[in-house]
């Protein structure tokens, strides 16, 4: 389960239609996309496909459904967030880099994003308390990790909403 970024792009843009074309078995490729506008799809197309759109293919509303279809369909390929990866599906190594938490934190694995929270001016009152609650170590290390997310405090790089990368955690 190794691909180059060029092969990944060729598969998801519909130029490669059989796994044999990228060194695999003689098996048709079945693309499964998340729906248009899904944050997972937007992230994948921006950072996995370098801004290209996926070919027209079956679309699913949830990552759980995507995982189930990929796990039960020979030749299927898709994308989900870490929280949905389990033994039923095999993550793909791209350009020799595995999609691990460490590789995301170090920005070696490029297909990642995190949510940004914005307020109208400096937060006050309940808004300020809620933001502090989300950033406390207990929530970052337990709840977020339990849900399959990497704590923003563990990130060694941050990405702005415009896609610019800089060294440092995403906590401001």
Which residues make up each language-model segment?
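Exported/periplasmic ABC-transporter solute-binding proteins
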Residues: 1-172
């Amino acid at each position: 389960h190794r691909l180059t970024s060029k092969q990944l792009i060729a598969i998801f843009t519909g130029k490669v239609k059989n796994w044999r074309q990228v060194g695999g078995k003689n098996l048709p490729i079945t693309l499964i996309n998340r729906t248009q506008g899904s944050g997972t799809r937007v992230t994948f197309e921006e950072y996995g496909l370098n801004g290209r759109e996926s070919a027209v293919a079956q679309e699913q509303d949830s990552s759980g459904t995507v995982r189930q279809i990929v796990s039960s369909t020979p030749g299927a390929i898709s994308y989900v967030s870490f929280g949905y990866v389990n033994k039923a599906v095999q993550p793909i190594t791209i350009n020799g880099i595995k999609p691990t938490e460490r590789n995301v934190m170090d920005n070696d694995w490029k297909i990642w994003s995190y949510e940004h929270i914005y307020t109208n001016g400096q937060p006050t009152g309940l808004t300020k308390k809620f933001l502090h609650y989300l950033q406390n170590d207990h929530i970052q290390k337990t709840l977020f990790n339990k849900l399959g997310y990497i704590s923003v405090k563990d990130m060694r790089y941050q990405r702005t909403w415009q896609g610019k990368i800089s060294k440092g955690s995403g906590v401001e």
